[in-house]
Amino acid sequence: MNSPLNNGAASTGNNVASIGAGTASIGVPFTIDTEVFFRNCNDFTARFPEQAARLGLNRQETALQCLQAVPPAYRLLQAKAKGMERTPTLSVNGSFVHSKYNPQEEARRILVSDFFQTAEVQSRCIFTGLGLGYLASQYIERFPAAEAVIVEADSNVFICFLASRRLDSFFRHRRLSLLIGIQPEEAASFLASTGWNSKILFKAPIFAEAYRQWYKTFFTLLERNKMKNSINAKTLERFGTLWLKNTVKNLGLLCSTAKVSCFKNAFSDAAAVVLAGGPSLTAHLEIVKKSSKGFIIIAVDTAMRACLRAGITPDFILSFDPQYWNYLHTAGLDTSKSVLISEAAVFPAVLRQCYRAVFFSNSSVPFARYLEGEGQNGDEDYTLAAGGSVATTAWDFARYIGAKPVIMAGLDLAYPHKQTHFAGSTFEEAVHTRSTRFASAEQANFNSLYSAFPSLHQDYAGSTVLTDRRMLLYAWWFESTLAKYPEIKTFNLMPRGVLIPGMSACSAEDFVGLIGGLPRTAIDERLEAIVKNAYSQTFLDGCGARERQLAASVKTMTEAAADLAVQAEKAGKLCRRLAECGGEEGTGKSGKSGNGNRTREQAALIAQLNTLDEKIKDGFAKDLVEVLCFSDESNADSSVPPMAAAEKVYGRICLMAQQVHEIFKKR
């Protein structure tokens, strides 16, 4: 093989090349066999054609150009250990990604570390940072049935990897996923959709300065997703049954209530002001009240009391919380001039109030879809986003009706000046009403401030403001959603809370210039026309057919819940029998004569269990289990034997199904 050329970042000869050979020497340049490089590119293209085309590695001429374009800071060098001259190591910006002496031995030592000794990691591992792939290659060689997910932000490192050696066995690995040179949001989204946790995430050091921010963003997104899943798990555990009970109590309204789909893009020529319930709302209401220009007013239920006190009548009120305490925000108020936007799982008393009209969005709870039916008001999906706060749903409704721009008021997502709510809010009044010498209002306010993992976060003024983990999750929802819909210009009116990238601050003067476009009279007339059209005689005449369809759905769900309870009980008994006949370590009788019989019995029991699992995972049962038996994986007790843990899960499903059956029977 010829000696490497030293005339650039990546130098090529007849069938040889070197990367970074022209820089100051920190080692002997490794000579690349371009035939090996092209062969690896072909294998990569065959396995991941879209990524190969995006990176320009799907054709020899463009692949060679990519190899030649590798910057001088990336250097393939010969390993320094004796006999390792044909083994490359990689240097980036003068720092070695692997051992400069023996990178293969280094990978072997990492692979026998504690991190790789768990069964979970040995079945699936996520590598953030590939380097020359020594660790990943040894991992899939040692655990051939394992799934390997590799995230490498730096495409130059990946090109060095392809140029390092033959990688036939690497690309033949059946359960291999590569995410090369993509945006951190895409990588985080992939892991969110396929499942991940920190126990299987192996973080490699970052040597390219240009990609430090990439990995910082990526890990931040993963943590946000982890936090979201944790909060969702607690929410489902707390409210799953309540959602179902409320939905069943509200069944009568499902057939006679129109859907929000009639508002889609209905106000594309109007601005919208969304009134959230943060501490700054009181000051914002004065600005909204003084304006004489026309704009849509969308209020969350928590802000309704303050709106009426300020003399503001919202066009829309949004209420989605299933709890009684949330109903108190609007209880006793005159809501007759506003349109309610809600869903079937809301607390029933909310729907008994008088409104200009009521419209339902699709429920965000999966099992409710079986009751809502299809085709009642068009076949399109009219589910409003549920970012954890009614303010996120209100913004999405403003987007749904086509409003531009959208101006958020009272959206602090923080505790400016240590205020938890706006003056005169239901929470504040309740705190003062219940305060005693031993449980003062100040103590209640302190508990509210410091019970949800408080922290300081950057605000719009460049300083910091007190917030908490839950509020930051809402802020992150706005940040990611605004990036998804850049055409929806959104502003934050005189903000005092957490800085939300993509949501610019808006002064009182700016507010006057942003609103307007559609006169108030035109807004009222259009709203009236939409309501009349939605509740037309044709719609009212169709209530009978929808009631019959709903009755059939209720009957099916009642029977399905009873059947699910039976199936889960059978599955629990099978788990117990599996453990008793030797399905758990340390159980079962000894003796060779019984081994064959026990093996056959175990196989038969497992086959029966698999059949029951398929039934449980089907249709309505699957959605019930997902919502009402949701469990946070981080709380799993690894010390419990698998069959005992499975029996516990089936017991929980059985109990849940029995409860659901009773709820439907008592309807």
Which functions belong to the PLM regions below?
Residues K404-G410, P416, E487-L493:
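Acidic/polar loop patches that form or flank catalytic/metal-binding clefts of enzymes
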Residues V151-D154, V300-T302, I407-D412:
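A short glycine-rich beta-strand->turn/loop micro-motif centered on a GG-aromatic cluster
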